[in-house]
Curated annotation (Swiss-Prot):
GO cellular-component term (any): extracellular region
Keyword DNA damage: no
Main location: secreted
Subcellular location: Secreted, Cell wall
Keywords, in A-Z order: Cell wall, Hydroxylation, Secreted
Organism: Nicotiana tabacum
Protein name: 200 kDa cell wall protein
Length: 15
């Protein structure tokens, strides 16, 4: 069975 993987959390860009 194909398991749906939730999208990764948004990455915050630190400058």
């Amino acid at each position: 069975n194909y398991q749906y993987s939730p999208p990764p959390p948004p990455k915050k860009k630190y400058y």
